Amino acid sequence: MPYASLDLDYDKEYKASWVVYPNSNFDPKVGHYLYNTYLDELEMGEELGFDGLCVNEHHQNAYGLMPSPIVPASALARRTSKAKIAVLGNAFGIREHPLTLAEEHAMIDCITGGRLISGMVRGIGAEYYSMGANPAFSHERFHEAHDLVIRAWTDEGPFSFEGKHY
């Protein structure tokens, strides 16, 4: 979901479209139009026979207007009935706590009747930086979050978990 109104000469004034690109360049009216257009396009994918609709996560950049793929996935869950909804990139390692994401993914999976595909990604350095997380720990945070989420989805009853990060 790129911000289609990005001034193509932005590189003359800004060093990058990630992290340092100011939010003052975002127009909420354009955002309203783009978010709804992109959701309409995803819904149309099911009408055209696509068997999967994909959303992902990116933070503080002009090329990915999807800081929480759970939001569009939940909208698609109610407006589609056949296509799988693939969250191909929820950066578990930079989130507040992976159990929140485990619950949200489980909830959407229930709403869709089992059509959710949960893709867990580590995220990239710029996103760790912008979220105040040290990228040096990204691999171990991801693996710990992954293990905790899988246990939350598969273990019976309450369980204890004592990790380095969670």
Segments from the language model and where they lie:
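N-terminal beta1-alpha1-beta2 module of alpha/beta enzyme domains
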Residues: 1-86
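Internal, glycine-rich beta/alpha segment that forms the wall or movable "lid"
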Residues: 10, 99-166
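Short coil/turn segments at secondary-structure junctions
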Residues: 22-29, 92, 129, 133
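Glycine-rich anion/phosphate-binding loops
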Residues: 32-37, 93-107
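Conserved N-terminal glycine/acidic-rich loop preference
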Residues: 41-43, 53-55, 94-99, 127-129
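Structural motif
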Residues: 56, 88, 119-121
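Active-site-proximal loop/turn and secondary-structure-junction residues that shape catalytic pockets
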Residues: 59-60, 91-93, 122-124, 165
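Glycine-rich "substrate-gating" loop/helix at the edge of Rossmann-like oxidoreductase active sites
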Residues: 62-65, 90-96, 135
